Amino acid sequence: MIKIKKGLNLPIAGRPEQVIYDGPAITEVALLGEEYAGMRPSMKVKEGDAVKKGQVLFEDKKNPGVVFTAPASGKIAAIHRGEKRVLQSVVIAVEGNDEIEFDRYAPDALAKLSGKEVRRNLIQSGLWTALRTRPFSKIPAVDAEPFAIFVNAMDTNPLAADPVVVIKEAAEDFRRGLLVLSRLTERKIHVCKAAGADVPSENAANIETHEFGGPHPAGLSGTHIHFIEPVGANKTVWTINYQDVIAIGRLFATGRLNTGRVVALGGSQVNKPRLLRTVLGAKVSQITAGELVDADNRVISGSVLNGAIAQGAHDYLGRYHNQISVIEEGRSKELLGWVAPQPDKYSITRTTLGHFLKNKLFKFNTAVNGGDRAMVPIGTYERVMPLDILPTLLLRDLIVGDTDSAQALGCLELDEEDLALCSFVCPGKYEYGPLLRKVLETIEKEG
């Protein structure tokens, strides 16, 4: 087992009950274009078109052959675009159960599949988009070969679902998905799970299981990659989430695209935090209807540390998100708040009484408690960064855009989520995720 000591389990109130309930009926789903780094869509549908589940909606011009398929049948209700015509979302009004059928295989045939057959079925169904590269966190090219594939079967994000609960309901599909991935490449398939977690595996020669323990970010793919198979400019691995492995197993067993999702609905503003069944790209406001405390709330698709605000054209469950988090907007000002002992406020430093209340869960809000200021290196980054890098120096280079030094310090190993804790504990109120993305784009473009 690999156990990390540095990190932070955020003591946030509203942790979900680890029992799966049926979610509300969903009448709108969408694909969010801005989730896919560097993607430029070539649209295959227009507003008003009827689509089947699994039908191609658009293709990536910059990554030919990579297609994005409909998570449900219905009609294209809207195609939202932002500045410079950036695709924000393709919205489908759900109607009927029409769907496209893909290749299916008998259980005993899965172990004999060729890599070409696996690749073709994943690409045609749109499940190829479940894979992401590291470095750069982009969808791999259809003819690319990874050095390894990392299956993330654990989640240490605040308010997250326990993967063991989700996988237990679909253990056979998870095993089939692992077997299919083992046929996609001859390289290693690293299945990463929490210490002692009951996660099934397969006996394929290239599948290895690893256990991780410790605080967040022990459950992030970036942490797993760093300790097992570090990447670089000339070494690429792929990552995939456990729920997508289940979807792959069902696709190859039934020939039908499975877009079901189990999401954790949690946070201090949720009346009954719990796990809910829904669908990929579901309208978040429909999931949360009647579930929230009547207040000025911020609804987030994903983790409170690294999720996206779910509203307007983005009011949909993200492709790579397995949770919906709800906290209160922090709009009120507090007069001389820094003078008070503040037992109801949490800080990683010893500046509030709440820091010393080890078993207390706090009602966090969106306030950053201060304005923008210079970066202040007082050791907070090192306390939450378990990777063997120099976080203060790396973060400084991200701020100034020094791509050469950032690359030398290990930025190619990282994704936005890997720096979310650094943003949370930053006295200077910097958001390091967008800064990292900007540097990665420059490195990819200029070398």
Curated annotation (Swiss-Prot):
It comes from the Bacteria. Its EC number is 7.2.1.1. The keyword Transport applies. It catalyses: a ubiquinone + n Na(+)(in) + NADH + H(+) = a ubiquinol + n Na(+)(out) + NAD(+). Disulfide bonds: none annotated. The keyword Ion transport applies. Pfam families: NQRA_2nd (PF24836), NQRA_N (PF05896), NQRA_SLBB (PF11973). Keywords: Ion transport, NAD, Sodium, Sodium transport, Translocase, Transport, Ubiquinone. GO terms for molecular function: oxidoreductase activity, acting on NAD(P)H, quinone or similar compound as acceptor. One of its GO terms (biological process) is sodium ion transport. NQR complex catalyzes the reduction of ubiquinone-1 to ubiquinol by two successive reactions, coupled with the transport of Na(+) ions from the cytoplasm to the periplasm. NqrA to NqrE are probably involved in the second step, the conversion of ubisemiquinone to ubiquinol. Belongs to the NqrA family. Composed of six subunits; NqrA, NqrB, NqrC, NqrD, NqrE and NqrF. NCBIfam families: nqrA, PRK05352.1-2, PRK05352.1-4. This is Na(+)-translocating NADH-quinone reductase subunit A. It comes from Neisseria meningitidis serogroup C / serotype 2a (strain ATCC 700532 / DSM 15464 / FAM18). The lineage of its organism: Bacteria, Pseudomonadati, Pseudomonadota, Betaproteobacteria, Neisseriales. The gene is nqrA.
